[in-house]
Amino acid sequence: MTAPVSPSLLAPVANGLVEDYLHQLGKGQPGTFDAMLDGQGQLRPGWQSLLGSLEGLGPTGRHQQHDEIQRLLAENGVIFNMHDETQGRSWRLDPLPWVIDEPQWQALEAGLIQRSRLLSALYDDIYGPKTLFEAGLLPTQELLASAHLILPCHQSLPNDRAPIVFHGVDVIQDTQGQWRVMADRLQAPSGTGLALENRILMARALPDMYRNAPLKRLAGFLDLHHRTLIAMAYQHRDNPTLILLTPGPGSPRYFEHAYLANYLNIALVEGQDLVVRDTQVWLRTLGGLQPVDVILRHCDDAYCDPLELRGDSQLGVPGLLQAMRAGGVALSNALGVGILEAPVLADYLPMLCEHLLGETLLLPNADITTKPATAPVFDSHLQRLEPTTLNLRCFVTRTPNATTKSSTAAKNSAAGEYQVMPGGLAWVGEPGLPSLSSTIVKDVWVTATSPQPHVSQLRQARGPVVATRDGTDLPSRVAESLFWLGRYGERLDTRARLLREALLRLMEYEQDEIADQLLDELLLALDITTLNEEDEQRLQAPLIGFDLKRTALLAQFDDVDPQALQPLFAQLMRNARSVRDHLGDDSWRVVHQLRQRMATFNPSLGASAARRACEGLSAQLAAFFGLCNETMPHHYGWRFMDIGRFLDRVLGLLSLLKLTLNAPHSPGLALWEVVLATTDNFTAYRRRYRSELHPAAILDLLLFDETNPRSVGYMLKRIERQMDRLPGTSSPYRNAERRLLIQANAALHLADIDRLSHLADTPEAQDALEQLLDALIEPLNALSEAISQSHFSHVERPRQLVSMGADA
């Protein structure tokens, strides 16, 4: 209960912010529990130093810290709802955390552990003897009609395994300060990675405030969770293979999946990466099939197995449920736990707790009459604290010594079965509001009475380790995404360079006849045709001449044309997000900067701004791939990305060279100058040949000079060198991609250079060049498909022939 209080009772250092907050509480509903102020209007334990630090920053400092936190959030890629590949929504992280003192936390912690034990026992009965149904202690009709009751999960857990390994619980505080449960999250409990990210960002943005705070750390909990996953393995217990199963980049939680997998040092995989054979789950890698021991799943029950559950699911693994039954793989959590999330169970839990555990339920569920407590959130615009309603997601993990119900820890100490993360994910909104629907999140600080030990992400090895460097454990899907990341990155760069040159000629339009002809050729190279009547109606104006060409060029920044910048960037982002855990932090920051550039550019700013945007885009793409080159291990994943880059680059160069032969306006040497500038060879050419343009010299530089990284010869050599180091079969014969590369190299090396040297004089030389370019383009176009067939997994997924669900 918060009562009126004299400002003099408040600590002077926090007087301004707290006095204003207290005034706002007085205008609200009286008798409301507040997270920061007690019934006498005094700051609760843990808030004093925090508010003092915030007050001491002053308005300017608080505004700067708020902006710094939001910048770090965006920089680290904390983006949600990214169904549009180039857009997304970021949360706003409140610089004022939610402080929970130790007595409050202990009450919540005890209730959370009890709830995990209760739901675990309830699962065992629902999918086991079903005595609760027989005794009338469950709403039989409602549960049997629920789509979350998975009948094939009956007695599916072998070896006395615990069904609930990780448990998310959404709670609020009511007007009396009592913790109440809004929902249980068991199928794909998300938020741990986000809670950890929020904590790390708070420590970076507010180092003094964080360092001086007596709070419990999160790293120990995640280390415990990782050790629990290891302990779950049936086989290979000394070094089990752990994976995190994600729905993929289309999931709004994909950022967290990648972040958590990276933090726990486990592979991030999708359903298509896995296959079940003889009740064993295997991971498809470049080096062959690798056995999987433990799956930390972030897919809902129904989507995990298209053979026995939802037949239309593309997210799961056919046969996964049978593998779980047979003990071929351990799952966190067991399939079927979705029934425990049913809201209809809420009224039965007090009785079930007495029946199954012999205990009184410590955490009651909220109901429609529950009124929420208030808590402060910092408004950076108004520079004050605003009372609001907070939701909190807590996380509970089973301990490593209690992965089976018959273990010593589980038998001797009920409290030892589970541990709670000392913190969580808090968000602003009405009780029960989904976290992704909120716009403001808070870090949660649980006060500690003693200094907390440091927990390293690296652990002391228990025995000898076999060094590995080749990267054969890379999932083939990841290799494919890296390959296409390289291709789309280079394709985007080539188009940006062509646009840059076209926009430069546009700015010189009607001032130089040659420049006008060059602009037409560049529009041809960009595959930009004259706008039709429908386009003119959309633009609400008939366009001719300069306006027509300017509009056509600036339209390349829209998403109308699939080969325009935005769609190409969308493909780049889709592949980058699918390999997020394989990219370094610095590389990902450049990706964020690219995303910002693409999202904020306004074509109405005109040709000059568009040209600068193209230059910046090329520079940032070079920075991204440069960082990948410097920071990624040069094993198979990097090699596939490199092959993709140089394959697309060489095809782009060959297409540009064909343009010089087919140019209807024949602007002559000026077009060769554009080719040199577009391929970034202008400086190298001038250093060798001064200012004189010779087509034969240009061809030598662009086609045959293997010391020039932008020449066809160099790029073919580089692709060949990378392909020589890829995993291959034991066959003595060359595979399809090797034969295609030999074909392209042979065409280049057997070219009649003397004949090509008369390019400017004879049509025969032009015919010879065209034949050479065609002889290069044909096998290189086929090379991409050959690589895909040899190295990337394209497996037809099994489907149900007969429906086997509850709604059958």
Identify the function of each model-found stretch.
Residues 158, 170, 294-301, 349, ...:
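ATP-grasp fold ATP-binding core
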